[in-house]
Amino acid sequence: MAAKDVKFNTEARNKMLKGVNILADAVKVTLGPKGRNVVLDKSFGAPRITKDGVSVAKEIELEDKFENMGAQMVKEVASRTNDEAGDGTTTATVLAQAIVREGMKSVAAGMNPMDLKRGIDLATAKVVEAIKAASRPVNDSAEVAQVGTISANGESEIGRQIAEAMQKVGNEGVITVEENKGLETETDVVEGMQFDRGYLSPYFVTNADKMIAELEDCMILLHEKKLSSLQPMVPLLEQVIQSQKPLLIIAEDVEGEALATLVVNKLRGGLKIAAVKAPGFGDRRKAMLQDIAILTGGQVISEDLGMKLESVTMDMLGTAKKISITKDETTIVDGAGEKAEIEARVAQIRTQIEETTSDYDREKLQERVAKLAGGVAVIRVGGMTEVEVKERKDRVDDALNATRAAVQEGVVVGGGVALVQAGKVLADLEGANADQTAGINIVRKAIEAPLRQIAENAGVDGAVVAGKVRESGDASFGFNAQTEEYGDMFKFGVIDPAKVVRTALEDASSVAGLLITTEAMVADKPQKDAPAGGGMPDMGGMGGMM
């Protein structure tokens, strides 16, 4: 085992604080509408330019092991906030730095670190309660756009497109962000359920120009296994022909004789029909077929449940207003499923999302929720160069996460003002002893840090701005860094999601509390380079040979 280097007390804390400051100073220049960019070097390709706090934090590794520990702990703050709220990573980093800095001063002055931490935790809980109480629900699409605009660093076009996408697919719908090949940023919306399986034969096409099969007011047969013969289905097909409605067959596969029979019937004009493979594989395929069944009000014909094709009746089929099938994908619009059943299914999948530990499974489950609940929107981000596209995509991702958070827990005044106003609840709060009260005061000072930093980045004195906001009796009074005006932040349209502000403070105080209570640090000793191998030693004369 390699030898370890151990540092104690003040020496350990100072090293750690240095690492915290290096990382936080690099991240905090991005905060606010007038925050600057950070350029990240890449081992290949062009450097990346970003204003995303967590992207900057993730790039930082320090040479000194002890300083690096401090930096990594603050990186954890940014990552946790990003995972929980999707935005607010820079705010969380600035808060963590402020709490650690003030806390270290108090520890150096001889206060008990554990009591300081208890005071910090108590104050954080009170401020979080105040933030929740001050939160108000998002009422309309204009407010959603404002949240998106603020998070995208004042680019109103991004806010507008996100609001538009959310309006179309609903709050439960999935919105994905991709890179566009062109200059423009566009939004595509797919309503209804879409899955990536196309028609099994081009003969099913109804619109030869577009090469798509369109079925209006359509019946849907969902079958779990392969169909190789249509013989068991003949009674059902006769009923479908009499009803004069089109039929879509979704099965594991339709092959050989069965497919040929369907194509011949379609070409003769007796049956409006199409067939596609079921989406997904294995257990996920079963679950997705069940989703389609609930969405369309039908049943999955499954041998596990003792159902046979011979006994299928018309009332076991699902129905949908419109189905369109291309060679690659199928879209079911306006299924006839019961709303209550769809909601119950969504709730069931949500429970699975909370319980799963796999990111891949979570993503697939979220897609299923979106397909059941509303639809899917894709925002394609454009730009002149690859570097610009990547930078904009970072901002669109942040803005999208912020708007989702706003819809979940409502909004509060932006620009760091919500924290300062919520901090007023700490004015008369006292801990069980003097050290706990000192911990409460650490939080009271630290929660002004984001407001100060936003002002500093706009070229204004942060202390003056913080003083004015603190002394104001109006809860929504603040400083608009974009226009450098004081006034009602709601009227300026400067609003933040309550969830983002809350999460940033909780994560920052949690990790900062751990840093303050650190008394010793252990790291691997740097390896000394071994000296270069010399030549072979002198072997002396070999003596005379006989």
UniProtKB/Swiss-Prot annotation:
InterPro entries according to UniProt: Chaperonin_Cpn60_CS, Cpn60/GroEL, Cpn60/GroEL/TCP-1, GroEL-like_apical_dom_sf, GROEL-like_equatorial_sf, TCP-1-like_intermed_sf
Function of the molecule: Together with its co-chaperonin GroES, plays an essential role in assisting protein folding. The GroEL-GroES system forms a nano-cage that allows encapsulation of the non-native substrate proteins and provides a physical environment optimized to promote and accelerate protein folding.
Summary of subunit composition and partner proteins: Forms a cylinder of 14 subunits composed of two heptameric rings stacked back-to-back. Interacts with the co-chaperonin GroES.
Protein name: Chaperonin GroEL
Stretches for region Disordered: 526-546
NCBIfam families xref list: GroEL (TIGR02348), PRK00013.1 (NF000592), PRK12849.1 (NF009487), PRK12850.1 (NF009488), PRK12851.1 (NF009489)
Biased composition annotated in UniProt, kind: Gly residues: 532-546
Annotated catalysed reactions: ATP + H2O + a folded polypeptide = ADP + phosphate + an unfolded polypeptide
Any GO CC annotation of this UniProt entry: cytoplasm
Keywords: ATP-binding, Chaperone, Cytoplasm, Isomerase, Nucleotide-binding
Binding residue positions for ATP: 30-33, 51, 87-91, 415, 496
Localization per Swiss-Prot or TrEMBL: Cytoplasm
